[in-house]
Design a protein with these regions (language model features):
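N-terminal leader segment of winged-helix/HTH proteins
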Residues: 1-46
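Pre-recognition alpha-helix immediately N-terminal to the DNA-recognition helix
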Residues: 52-57
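Short capping segments at the starts of secondary-structure elements
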Residues: 60-66
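A short acidic, leucine-rich amphipathic alpha-helix
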Residues: 69-75, 86
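Basic amphipathic alpha-helical segments that dock to polyanions
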Residues: 86-96
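Non-DNA-binding regulatory cores of transcription-related proteins
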Residues: 95-185
């Protein structure tokens, strides 16, 4: 699926790969819903009220949420919601590329580039739990070339990396500051 979507990504201060702590998720949720509506129009799929609500719940923050966390939040709105309801909605959203599943956490996070063909890299903060989707084609190329070099064909080149986000790096955290200096050369 490689469909250009019209909704603009948040370009306000604090809306970077890792939004600042005071970031208002309203724009993220609005963009996600607009993208979902547009993709559904393009593909003929239906964004039911339940699917829309689950998408909003996934986008309520930048932390990956497990299906049962989503169910717990959904039950505040729809007390009779059951696990299969959530899993069906998540499968629909995954199928359209509106969300991603973070395998190592068994959790879901909103896709920042729905409608575009891409392999994501996820940066997961071990301190605050937030995750950011990164798109670095050089990482994809290195993985593909490295795998091909040993006769391996990648089927799902999703990368999940744990570390500290900019908001959680403290000036007194010398190890993280040293790692940042080393990475920046």
């Amino acid at each position: 699926m490689n469909r250009a979507l019209k909704s603009k990504k948040c370009e306000k201060p604090g809306c970077g790969v890792f939004p600042s702590r005071g970031h208002n998720h309203g724009a993220c949720i609005a963009n996600a819903i607009n993208d979902a509506e547009e993709l559904c129009t393009q593909t003929g799929a239906r964004l039911t009220p339940l699917r829309r609500t689950v998408l909003k719940l996934v986008w309520q923050g930048h932390k990956p949420l497990g299906a049962y966390d989503i169910l717990q939040d959904l039950r505040k709105i729809r007390p009779s919601a059951e696990p299969p309801t959530v899993y069906r909605a998540l499968e629909f959203l995954l199928g359209l590329g509106l969300i991603h599943r973070i395998e190592r956490l068994n959790a879901y996070v909103g896709c920042s580039h729905p409608g575009e063909t891409h392999e994501g890299q996820f940066l997961i903060c071990r301190s605050c739990g937030r995750a950011a989707e990164l798109h670095d084609t050089s990482i994809n190329k290195a993985l593909t070339n490295g795998a091909a070099g040993v006769g391996f064909v990648l089927e799902n080149p999703m990368v999940e990396v744990e570390g500290l986000c900019p908001n959680c790096i403290r000036p007194s955290n010398k190890i993280s500051k040293n790692k940042i200096r080393q990475a920046n050369g």
